[in-house]
A protein has these predicted regions:
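Short polar catalytic/cofactor-binding loops
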Residues: 10-15
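CN hydrolase (nitrilase-like) catalytic-core segments centered on the catalytic cysteine
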Residues: 65-82, 149-231
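Active-site catalytic loop in hydrolytic enzyme cores
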Residues: 90-163, 173-175, 179-181, 238-253
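Short beta-strand scaffold segments in enzyme catalytic cores
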Residues: 83-85, 97-101, 131, 212-214, ...
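Cys-nucleophile CN-hydrolase/nitrilase-fold catalytic domain and related Cys-dependent amidase chemistry
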Residues: 18, 26-104, 172-192
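Extreme N-terminal starter segment of soluble prokaryotic enzymes
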Residues: 2-8
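Short beta->alpha transition motifs characteristic of CBS
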Residues: 48, 55, 100, 111-117, ...
C-alpha cells in the first residue's frame, strides 16, 4: 500500500466574491503543497460561498477560464485539487452544484451534486455525479453534501473500486452530530477512508460547524479540526497506518 497525503481545506468563503475567493484558494493550495499534499479538497461551493440567491448570477460554464489558475497551479504543485462552484450546462439553463477536479497532470474533470437538500430545488437541478479519480493506485470518489445522506451513494463508490470517499459539505452546528455519525458509519461498515471538508465560518445564513475530519477504514477518526476557522486537516498514510494533523491558516483578505 503506497503512501498517501490527503487534506481537507476548511475554508471561510467571502460571499459571492469569485475573484477574492479564487486568490485565497490559490494561497491555500500553496500552503497545502508545503505539507506535500497529494489531494486537496475544498468545501461545497467554496469559490462563491453557499449563496443560492446568487448562484444563477455566479454560475460558470464547465470550461470556464476562471478555473485556469487553479488548473495551472495544481499541475505546478503536483497536487490534485477539488474546488466548489455553481455550474451552468451548455445543454440547458439548469444550475448545478459542482466540484471541479484539477489534476496534478493538468487535467480537469467535473462532478455535479446528485441529491439536493430540501429547498435547493428552487435554484438548483440534480446533477449526474462523476467518475472516481485515480491517484496512484488509489481511487477517490467525490461527493457533495446531501449526496452522502444516501447510503446508496457511498455503496456505489465502493462498487466502483473507490477506497477513499471525499465529500465537500456545508454542515451546520445542528446537523453535525447526525452527519458525522453517518460518515463514520461508512468508514466502519464499508471500509472506506472518508475525508470531509466543511466551511470554516458562516455561509448563506448557516452557522457552519467546521470540524472537517478524516475517518480511516474501519471507522477510527484520525483527525478533526477543533471547531471553526480556516485550517488544513491532514491525513497521512504510511505503511498502511493513518496519522493526522491540523494546521491553522491566516489568509490574506
Amino acid at each position: 500500500m503506497t503512501d498517501l497525503d490527503l487534506c481537507a481545506a476548511q475554508y471561510s468563503a467571502i460571499a459571492g466574491d469569485l475573484d477574492a475567493n479564487l486568490q485565497r484558494h490559490l494561497q491555500v493550495m500553496r500552503l497545502a503543497a508545503e505539507q506535500r499534499i497529494d489531494f486537496l479538497l475544498f468545501p461545497e461551493l467554496s469559490l462563491t460561498g453557499y449563496e443560492p440567491s446568487l448562484a444563477r448570477e455566479l454560475a460558470q460554464a464547465t470550461d470556464t477560464a476562471l478555473l485556469q489558475p487553479v488548473r495551472t497551479l495544481a499541475k505546478q504543485l503536483r497536487m490534485t485539487t477539488v474546488v466548489g462552484l455553481p455550474l451552468r450546462t451548455a445543454e440547458s439553463d439548469a444550475i448545478l452544484i459542482g466540484s471541479a477536479l484539477c489534476g496534478a497532470d493538468g487535467s480537469q474533470a467535473i462532478y455535479t451534486k446528485q441529491h439536493l437538500h430540501a429547498g435547493e430545488e428552487r435554484v438548483f437541478s440534480p446533477g449526474t455525479g462523476g467518475a472516481p479519480l485515480h491517484l496512484g493506485d488509489e481511487r477517490i470518489a467525490l461527493s457533495i453534501c446531501a449526496d452522502f445522506t444516501h447510503a446508496s451513494h457511498a455503496r456505489a463508490a465502493v462498487e466502483r473500486g473507490a477506497g477513499i470517499y471525499a465529500t465537500s459539505v456545508l454542515i451546520s452546528e445542528n446537523g453535525y452530530p447526525h452527519d458525522s455519525e453517518l460518515l463514520e458509519g461508512y468508514a466502519r461498515e464499508l471500509s472506506l477512508g472518508v475525508l470531509m471538508a466543511n466551511h470554516g465560518g458562516p455561509s448563506g445564513g448557516w452557522s457552519c460547524a467546521g470540524r472537517s475530519a478524516f475517518w480511516a477504514p474501519g471507522g477510527r477518526q484520525v483527525v478533526s479540526a477543533v471547531g471553526t476557522g480556516d485550517c488544513l486537516v491532514i491525513a497521512r498514510r504510511r505503511q498502511g497506518i493513518w496519522q493526522g494533523q491540523t494546521l491553522e491558516l491566516s489568509l490574506d483578505n
